[in-house]
């Protein structure tokens, strides 16, 4: 299974954008019924999502960010959409305990957007109905009055650990709100990648190629991974238990496995380099 790299939000009350989002190159399209839709249009947005899911085409996965399950709207969203074959997963906002995940009719990504959600991250991630977790950083930073990026990194790492311990895919980054600042987006993605985050949600199609490039292995990384994999294959042919690199260093099985993942990701995201 390929882990998504790019996730594109599209407002649920803008159905004319659904097909464009699916054709944007994003791995996952997220129809948003929550923050992007004013209360007066939420019923309309839900109906739009249902109509699209009934006829959807294309290779991108389609998720729906529903309204808070603590509200009647969230439960209505689940009732209307949960049984539709075109829905791959729902994104649940403001998850603060594992109990709210019981009995869901569809796979769920839990969004951790509060102090309570971070504290409960491990139990939420371990819930059998959860297939991924992500951070809602703007709400979280506002609640905690955080302006220091290093403090946010501490919270991000807690969620990275919770996902890994539960055997979930890597945690994607939250949206970068400045659509015009592509250099800032790329730098932010690289910083997130360095602490174990992988992939990112976007709010505009123009952000998709920037995110994709930022999470693609560099030439230096692919060269190093190739060297490790080749050394591992030579050791296996020779019946050697240890893998020695040309520079004399030894690497163990987890390093070899990571090198194989790096090469697989590079071939997926930049196949022209492997032709």
Which residues fall in each region the model found?
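Expand to "…catalyze enediolate/carbanion chemistry for C-C bond making/breaking, isomerization
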Residues: 1-275
């Amino acid at each position: 299974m390929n882990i998504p790299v790019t996730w594109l939000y599209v407002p649920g009350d803008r159905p004319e954008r659904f097909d464009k989002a699916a054709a944007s190159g994003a791995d996952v399209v997220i129809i948003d019924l929550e923050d992007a839709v004013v209360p007066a249009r939420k019923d309309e947005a839900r109906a739009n999502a249902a109509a699209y899911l009934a006829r959807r085409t294309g290779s991108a996965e389609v998720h729906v960010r529903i309204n808070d399950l603590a509200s009647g709207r969230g439960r209505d969203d689940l009732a209307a959409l949960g049984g539709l074959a075109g829905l791959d997963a729902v994104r649940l906002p403001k998850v603060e305990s594992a109990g709210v995940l019981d009995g869901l009719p569809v796979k769920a990504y839990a969004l951790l957007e509060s102090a309570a959600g971070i504290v409960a991250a491990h139990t939420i991630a371990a819930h059998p109905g959860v297939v991924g977790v992500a951070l809602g950083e703007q709400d979280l930073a506002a609640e905690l009055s955080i302006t220091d990026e290093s403090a946010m990194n501490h919270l991000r790492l807690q969620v990275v650990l919770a996902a890994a311990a539960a055997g979930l895919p890597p945690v994607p980054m939250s949206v970068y709100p400045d659509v015009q600042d592509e250099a800032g987006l790329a730098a932010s993605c690289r910083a997130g990648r360095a602490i174990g985050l992988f992939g990112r949600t976007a709010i505009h199609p123009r952000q998709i190629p920037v995110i994709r490039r930022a999470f693609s292995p560099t030439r230096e990384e692919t060269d190093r991974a190739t060297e490790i994999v080749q050394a591992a294959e030579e050791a296996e042919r020779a019946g050697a238990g240890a893998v020695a690199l040309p520079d004399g260093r030894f690497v163990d099985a987890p390093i070899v496995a990571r090198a194989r993942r790096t090469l697989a990701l590079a071939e997926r995201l930049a196949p022209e380099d492997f032709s």
